[in-house]
Curated annotation (Swiss-Prot):
Signal peptide segment: 1-23
Keyword Glycoprotein: yes
Main location: secreted
Cellular component, GO annotation: axon terminus; C-fiber; dendrite; endocytic vesicle; extracellular region; extracellular space; neuronal cell body; perikaryon
Glycosylation, residue list: 126
Organism (species): Rattus norvegicus
Keyword set, alphabetical order: Chemotaxis, Cytokine, Disulfide bond, Glycoprotein, Inflammatory response, Pyrrolidone carboxylic acid, Secreted, Signal
One GO term (biological process): response to wounding
Cited Gene3D superfamilies: 2.40.50.40
Protein name per Swiss-Prot or TrEMBL: C-C motif chemokine 2
Keyword Cell inner membrane: no
Gene: Ccl2
PTMs per UniProt: Processing at the N-terminus can regulate receptor and target cell selectivity. Deletion of the N-terminal residue converts it from an activator of basophil to an eosinophil chemoattractant. N-Glycosylated.
Length: 148
């Protein structure tokens, strides 16, 4: 009898812990990228495609992770001057790229869209913006796009 009470208590404890763990949001259990060391060399800017900042309290260090065109991730010290310079350049390139995409979409639709008052073209781009054309009543709603 005493063994069954102990076993029942143990089973109840395991069930209570399982419910607590399973009720956690997925973001908490998601894999986390942390940097434990930084690159000692400057990376050639021409090899970089993007970056992300690591600021999680679950990581031992704040870091910048540069993503190369070959999809390799390299940890860098966010306090280094060359890292800050590369971040500014990548941010400028991203803005330039988005502006070019918006311009191409707007100019293409201005020249090739049929004249139809109720026509709305949905294209993919990186912000939610409404462009009105000057040659017709056509409007273009640009929603989100990611460039690879």
């Amino acid at each position: 009898m005493q063994v069954s009470v102990t076993l029942l208590g143990l089973l109840f404890t395991v069930a209570a812990c399982s419910i607590h763990v399973l009720s956690q949001p997925d973001a908490v259990n998601a894999p986390l990228t942390c940097c434990y060391s930084f690159t000692g060399k400057m990376i050639p800017m021409s090899r970089l495609e993007n970056y992300k900042r690591i600021t999680s309290s679950r990581c031992p260090k704040e870091a910048v992770v540069f993503v190369t065109k070959l999809k390799r991730e390299i940890c860098a010290d966010p306090n280094k001057e060359w890292v800050q310079k590369y971040i500014r350049k990548l941010d400028q390139n991203q803005v330039r790229s988005e502006t070019t995409v918006f311009y191409k979409i707007a100019s293409t639709l201005r020249t090739s869209a049929p004249l139809n008052v109720n026509l709305t073209h949905k294209s993919e781009a990186n912000a939610s913006t409404l462009f009105s054309t000057t040659t017709s009543s056509t409007s273009v709603e640009v929603t989100s796009m990611t460039e690879n």
